[in-house]
Amino acid sequence: MEIPKYKIALIVGAGEGLSASLARLFAKQGIRVALAARKIEKLGALCRETGARAFACDATDADEVERLFGMVEREIGTPDIVVYNASGRARGVFTDLVPAEVAQAIAVSAFGGFLVAQQAAKRMLPHKHGAILFTGASASVKGYPQSAPFAMGKFAQRGLAQSMARELSPQGIHVAHFVIDGGIRSTARVEPADRPDSMLDPDAIALSYWNVLQQPRSAWTWELELRPWVEKF
């Protein structure tokens, strides 16, 4: 079995939590890491820890996304792993939602994913090699009250990933969508005392991403659901 080998990873929507865990894991595997976010000041410590480079980018702006890939190529190289970890939310009672805020939330979760994935695919297809990974959520498969914009964006993102997987997988590009069905533990967000183990460990999630990246072509996963063992579903 031939295990895919990767050299450069780009994580879009980078911040603390899962993005940081992915950056650390990729760096430990000898993969060079690029981090993209609207505000990169928050990424300084992670860059120093992992040797990653940070790039400012609004993922909903087509020109900025194209420039992002150009800068990453010039400064690091062409990414053969691209993770889309950005999402937008606009919470509220359905009849009170502000249309402009809803449009922005959907743009971040779905349209930004399209823009980033399109630039990634253009560069991966000539080599018939690469992986494009999308971070989904419980809202990717079920809508919750007062969370319609998040559900719309995540449902659309999942549809994008599924369509891409069916089109690009036969051309050598591994497209995978991860349904993160539960809250992710962080320094600012921990399990309540009466519900131990009720949140996902970001390092454990990152390991699942890595396991998917290591799959031989004869047995690729397109979608994976991850949740704590105590989570009801």
Where are these regions (language model features)?
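A short, exposed helix-loop element centered on a Lys and neighboring polar residues
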Residues: 117-118, 162
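Conserved glycine-rich cofactor-binding loop
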Residues: 15-16
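Catalytic Tyr-X3-Lys loop
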Residues: 88, 95-114, 133, 157
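C-terminal helical subdomain
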Residues: 170-185, 191-233
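Catalytic loop of short-chain dehydrogenase/reductase
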Residues: 131-156, 162, 166-169, 184
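Active-site loop of short-chain dehydrogenase/reductase
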Residues: 6-7, 78-79, 93, 124-137, ...
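Rossmann-fold cofactor-recognition segment
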Residues: 49-63
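Conserved glycine-rich Rossmann-like NAD(P)H-binding loop of the short-chain dehydrogenase/reductase
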Residues: 29-45
